[in-house]
Structures are given as structure tokens and as C-alpha cells.
Amino acid sequence: MKGFSVKPLIWITMLFLGLLPYQAFGLGLTPGNFDTILDTHVETLTVWQLAENNKIYVFDFHGLVTQGKTFNRITHLTEQIQANAGYPRVLTTDEFIKYMDSLRRTQADFAFGHDLLVSELVLFYNLADRDKIDLLPEEIVLRTFLLDQGLIKVWRNFYQSVQSDVVILSIPQEQPHTEGTPPVSKLARQAIFLHELSHGEYYTNPHFAAYCRLFWNQSLNDAQRRAFVNLFKKYNYNTASGELMVNEMQAYLMFTPDPQSFSASKLGVTEGELASMRDMFRRGRPPTRLPLR
């Protein structure tokens, strides 16, 4: 019928059948500074726009599983090595589940936080379309948000970045341990948020990014760089990406205040050497307002 759109009917049907998270409707932006975001308890998915840097959006999830279903497969594409793949591609749902099983991981603990440029999200959705990969409902909700906020658009059946320099971060709320889901303590939430926020700073502050590259290449010695690369191999990062190594180095070294996530023993150095690296980073006066450890 003229003037009638089936799209709302499809969404309502999917919601009724449990195929879409209830957060799919009315997902907008809430302004908030670092402390407000960190200290606010939310029962449903909330998307914050960071007051200190309006190019950073923070997806604040009530549960790790929903966060994982939204971002894990995208992070696998952008940050991890794709074995036996001649070209970048999005894994099917079954392939990704098998991949997580091989790592003894689940949607809940594959990653505890995420950081993505809008341009990387465009890559994910275009590759998924190219290979006719079925998206999870949570991934569809994310795509709809990006379209509704004018961050991406569709042109000739391809997704394009409209604001390619906007950064999407993801963090979980505090939660107790449940069967199949690890706990997230207050300290862990703070560490995850600060860690991911440092990635946002790296992406949106070119002076800070340049400082970090200089620190990696000129301040750290070969053994220290190898220590970070070896650690990141254990975390399944794509260590062939030099830019990723620099970005992760600064985030773990200076902005991960949780010994369960990062410590001298995990890096394979002494406490004194770790303290020395942090001191070198601070003494160089990095151009950032983030709190340095």
C-alpha cells in the first residue's frame, strides 16, 4: 500500500519473537563526563557522549553477554589474526563460536571492553554484506544506531562513513559472578573504562598518538618492545600491526589500573622496570588530559 512501510512491522515482529534486544527502540545519546559515566548504574544499554571529548561515544552495557554479541565479532575482524584467510572477512556465527571455543572463551569473556572507529564498523558491515553473513540482532541494533545518529550512511548499497573520526567504546556495568559469566568489580569497571578511553584519546588526539609512537620507537628498548609484543600475542592481538602494538602499549602501560589485567609479572619484567617505563612516559609530558598512572 502506498505510504505504508513494512520496516516497523518487521522490527515489532522480531522484538516479539525475541530476535531483537528491547534496547533497539529509542536508543539515543546521553551526555556525561568521565565520573558521571563511571559512577552511574544503568539497567539497560545506555550510550553516552563523553563531555570531555564529543567524538567519543560510550556503550554502557548491563551485561557482558549482550556486550559480547554486539562487539566481539567486530573486534575479531579489526584486532585479531585471521588464520587461513586470504583476505579480511567476517566469520559466520558458527565459525566465530568455534573460534571462541578454541580459545576457551565465550561471548561473556572474549573481551571485557571494545574500541572501534566508525570507519572500522563500516568495514565490518560491508564485508558482512559482501559475503552474505547473517548478523546477530545485537549487531543490527548497533548498525541502526550508527545510521540513526548520522555516523554512517548507505550509498549505492554500500555503507559509508559520515563521521569517520568518531570512536565507539564499550564497557560493562559492575556485576557479580554467575554461571558462565565472570564478575566485574568496581576496580575492573574503572580499569576497563580508562583503558578504552585511552584508545579513544589515541584515535582523536593526533599529538598524543605521535607521542606514543615516539615513546615506543625511541624510549623503549628492544627487550621491552618484545615483552609487550609477547604479551599481546597471548591476548590474541594481531602483532603484525605496529600501530595496534603502540596503541595497546600505552593503554596497558599507563591506563589499566587493575593488576588482574596488567602487571609486571604479566609483562615479564620486574616491578622496578615497569615503574621505570611509566616514569619515562610521564616525564616526556604526553599531550593528554587523561590521568597518568
Q: What does each model-identified segment do?
A:
Residues 1-6:
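N-terminal secretory signal peptides that target proteins for export/translocation
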Residues 7-26:
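Classical Sec-dependent N-terminal signal peptides that target proteins to the secretory pathway
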Residues 24-170, 286-293:
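A metal-dependent hydrolase signature that marks the N-terminal structural subdomain at the beginning
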Residues 171-193:
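Short pre-active-site segment immediately N-terminal to the catalytic Zn-binding motif
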Residues 171-175, 198, 206, 258:
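Short, flexible loop/turn elements at secondary-structure junctions
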Residues 187, 204-231:
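Post-HEXXH active-site segment of zinc metalloproteases
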Residues 191-204:
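Active-site recognition of the HExxH zinc-binding catalytic motif
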